[in-house]
Amino acid sequence: MAHMKTRLVYASILMMGALCLYFSMDSFRELPFVFKKSHGKFLQIPDIDCKQKPPFLVLLVTSSHKQLAARMAIRKTWGRETSVQGQQVRTFFLLGTSDSTEEMDATTLESEQHRDIIQKDFKDAYFNLTLKTMMGMEWVYHFCPQTAYVMKTDSDMFVNVGYLTELLLKKNKTTRFFTGYIKPHDFPIRQKFNKWFVSKFEYPWDRYPPFCSGTGYVFSSDVAIQVYNVSESVPFIKLEDVFVGLCLAKLKIRPEELHTKQTFFPGGLRFSVCRFQKIVACHFMKPQDLLTYWQALENSKEQDCPAV
């Protein structure tokens, strides 16, 4: 038994040493998979002057060219919220480029009409979500560091902007803050045909550092700036939530809970008015369902619900 305990202690020391070595490395620029901050240029930027009117919360929504219906549903629901509890809120969509000239032209027209699209010249694809997310961080870094908070989410999400704003005001933590649905002990998937496969060459360790589900996470604006600055010194991984988690680990920023009860639902949630009044984000939302649920919530603002 004593021999077994000794082996476990040695194994733990070796693992901690490996992790310390990994996160203390200054640069991974010799590896083929490294994010380049200076790569690409902005094709579309939204109509906002953060210096003159700093927002309290900016929501960055990853989307694709074909998801126009989802963007329109968001614009008619939680994305139309611009003033919540006296705080300015703005929602923008993150896109890459398409091989289709028609789609690119349509997106340009959409951007001119709504002035809410952020776009750079990289191919819009699922496995470029890390590039898309880092584009959002870069935009905050260059154009809107004055915002207090940022939320990164997806186009198939319900977001309760009002409740999120309420919780952020109560939390009142405006530096080194990162929250969402926390995954503290996830491990890399090594099966090659799995959608989330990560090779040992990309990431040789058996566990990821704590990160938040990419369906929706919220952070203070200084974190966006710090993540952007440190991003070139972290191995590039196509799983954007894991990549951001690696950046957080490098920065020694640990994700924390926003509320004592669960408020982020990456696995979805059955709709009810009272339940959705007290959540922040819910996944697997079809455009028509989002419109229906939002109208139900709007119609029931005076409804008495049990305290949460």
UniProtKB/Swiss-Prot annotation:
Lumenal topology ranges: 26-308
GO cellular component assignments: Golgi membrane
Enzyme Commission designation: 2.4.1.-
GO BP, sorted A to Z: lipid metabolic process; protein glycosylation; response to bacterium
Enzyme class name: transferase
Annotated tissue distribution: Expressed in brain and kidney.
InterPro entries on file: Glyco_trans_31 (IPR002659), Nucleotide-diphossugar_trans (IPR029044)
Topological domain spans for side Cytoplasmic: 1-7
Protein origin, superkingdom: Eukaryota
PANTHER family named among the record's database cross-references: BETA-1,3-GALACTOSYLTRANSFERASE 5, BETA-1,3-N-ACETYLGLUCOSAMINYLTRANSFERASE
Functional note: Catalyzes the transfer of Gal to GlcNAc-based acceptors with a preference for the core3 O-linked glycan GlcNAc(beta1,3)GalNAc structure. Can use glycolipid LC3Cer as an efficient acceptor. Also catalyzes the transfer of Gal to the terminal GalNAc unit of the globoside GB4, thereby synthesizing the glycolipid GB5, also known as the stage-specific embryonic antigen-3 (SSEA-3).
Family note: Belongs to the glycosyltransferase 31 family.
Name this protein carries in UniProt: Beta-1,3-galactosyltransferase 5
Species for this entry: Mus musculus
Gene name of the record: B3galt5
